[in-house]
Amino acid sequence: MRQRTIVCPLIQNDGAYLLCKMADDRGVFPGQWALSGGGVEPGERIEEALRREIREELGEQLLLTEITPWTFSDDIRTKTYADGRKEEIYMIYLIFDCVSANREVKINEEFQDYAWVKPEDLAHYDLNVATRKTLRLKGLL
């Protein structure tokens, strides 16, 4: 089984948290709301990976003013690729508290939508199990 280290930013701006709705045809949690993030590449430092994933998935205009390592977790997930292939992967999640100076987001093809959500509204979203676990641990659910 392949192992991946995943960096996940929990991005907050003015009391709201950024959620992204996964594309219906790919990823570990197709069609559900999630935190952004992705895999650390060989030779890449953790914060470099986090900043790269944010640029790739959320665009160049989203400006982070704070990045603080927060917690980690792990599990085994089945990933679905755009071509329909499936793969079981051991995932290690490194989760960061992040604060953004703005809300200028331009999502890539991995997502179909995004939202800035106040803590009291988070429970109204179809959150994937990993995001739900993270938000509970943070005391937001």
Curated annotation (Swiss-Prot):
PROSITE patterns: NUDIX, NUDIX_BOX. NCBIfam families: PRK15472.1. GO terms for molecular function: dCTP diphosphatase activity; dTTP diphosphatase activity; dUTP diphosphatase activity; magnesium ion binding. Residues 1-141 form the Nudix hydrolase domain. It holds the Pfam family NUDIX. Catalyzes the hydrolysis of nucleoside triphosphates, with a preference for pyrimidine deoxynucleoside triphosphates (dUTP, dTTP and dCTP). It is an enzyme of class 3 (hydrolase). A motif (Nudix box) lies at residues 38-59. It catalyses: a ribonucleoside 5'-triphosphate + H2O = a ribonucleoside 5'-phosphate + diphosphate + H(+); a 2'-deoxyribonucleoside 5'-triphosphate + H2O = a 2'-deoxyribonucleoside 5'-phosphate + diphosphate + H(+); dUTP + H2O = dUMP + diphosphate + H(+); dTTP + H2O = dTMP + diphosphate + H(+). Belongs to the Nudix hydrolase family. NudI subfamily. Its EC number is 3.6.1.9, 3.6.1.12, 3.6.1.-, 3.6.1.23. Monomer. This is Nucleoside triphosphatase NudI. It comes from Escherichia coli O157:H7. Keywords: Hydrolase, Magnesium. Its cofactor is Mg(2+).
